[in-house]
Amino acid sequence: MPHGPGTSARPVRVLVVDDSALVRETLAAVLASDPGIEVIGAAGDPYAAVERMRRQAPDVITLDIEMPRMDGLTFLRKLMAQHPIPVVICSSLATAGAEPALRALECGAVEVVAKPRLGTRRFLEESRVRLCDAVKAAARAGPGRPRASAPLVQAKLTADAVLARPRSDAVLQTTERVVVVGASTGGTEALRELLAALPGDAPGLVIVQHMPEVFTAAFARRLDGLCAVAVKEAADGDAVVPGRALIAPGNRHTLLRRSGARYHVEVRDGPLVCRHRPSVDVLFRSAARYAGRNAVGVIMTGMGDDGARGLAELKRSGADTIAQDEATSVVFGMPREAIRLGAADRVLPLPAIPPELLRLCR
């Protein structure tokens, strides 16, 4: 296990940058509640952030996009060019903020999370988990060459909390191939590369990318404009058909189902599974039950272990399984845990995954 930010060596040092004093206070309190994180300060704009960074170097910055004097995107570009550092974008759950947040990922931000809002106790706890996990993932990813991530070992709800009881093996008798994909930290760019390399008649795909609600719709629209396959945010009941990729909506679980000879998705609420909603484990386990040997499972870059057990269940059901390799993963957590469990038939660099998918689905 490597020493450095986010490991047992010392806490991750975080600088909070947001123009709202209330938000700065809230974010600092949420982050400070995690013993693996140390908040070294807060700044109301990028200029104040630079002054703070000169006094004490943070490991990670949380950054708002809408700020006075200099907007977050401009500051991010300057940071990446002059002083690369892991950045987590903290954005409001507003549709207008989705596109700038995606641009921030393209500019070098590691993660995008929603700002914590007032709500139920469960909602506040989930917001805390997501924010703290994002900061730790960013620290592991780093601004330069990716660093490996040790899988988190945490008490967690299993996918049984969301999945219905399995059906008989009779549901597996269909010839349609379906590809299920799971990704987290670093996944937005990895998925873009994966989907852009597929032809317009590629097998149907269902994808879980850990991302807040609202942002997944904008992410799907952006991919749709770049890829030969059609890409859309999944809606309950959407058919899984060749030439289309369905992106699981943020904050809801997406499951694969079968009706007659066709596959479709079910989108539903439910508890966090492996600290996430949507959960890769939920998607993979549903694919194991309803598609089995007709499925191909792919686990990609990401921190933690979401999807590792689901990929193992897919393999046991007869599906082909692939894990992204360490060299091309931004954070080698989810794939490494899947490999450790013996869940991956193949461990491949990112550029080799699209042609292998097509070969397996011929």
From Swiss-Prot:
NCBIfam families per UniProt: PRK00742.1, PRK12555.1
Its job: Involved in chemotaxis. Part of a chemotaxis signal transduction system that modulates chemotaxis in response to various stimuli. Catalyzes the demethylation of specific methylglutamate residues introduced into the chemoreceptors (methyl-accepting chemotaxis proteins or MCP) by CheR. Also mediates the irreversible deamidation of specific glutamine residues to glutamic acid.
Record's protein name: Protein-glutamate methylesterase/protein-glutamine glutaminase 5
CDD domains: CheB_Rec, REC_CheB-like
Catalytic activity: [protein]-L-glutamate 5-O-methyl ester + H2O = L-glutamyl-[protein] + methanol + H(+); L-glutaminyl-[protein] + H2O = L-glutamyl-[protein] + NH4(+)
GO biological process, one term: chemotaxis
Gene Ontology MF: a single term: phosphorelay response regulator activity
Domain annotation CheB-type methylesterase: ranges: 172-362
Family per similarity comment: Belongs to the CheB family.
Organism: Anaeromyxobacter dehalogenans (strain 2CP-C)
Residues recorded with modification 4-aspartylphosphate: 64
Ribonucleoprotein in keyword set: no
Domain Response regulatory: 13-130
Domain topic, free-text comment: Contains a C-terminal catalytic domain, and an N-terminal region which modulates catalytic activity.
Bilayer-spanning residue ranges: none
Signal peptide: none
Family annotation (InterPro entries): CheB-like, CheB_C, CheY-like_superfamily, Sig_transdc_resp-reg_Me-estase, Sig_transdc_resp-reg_receiver
One Pfam match: CheB_methylest
PANTHER family in the record: PROTEIN-GLUTAMATE METHYLESTERASE/PROTEIN-GLUTAMINE GLUTAMINASE, PROTEIN-GLUTAMATE METHYLESTERASE_PROTEIN-GLUTAMINE GLUTAMINASE
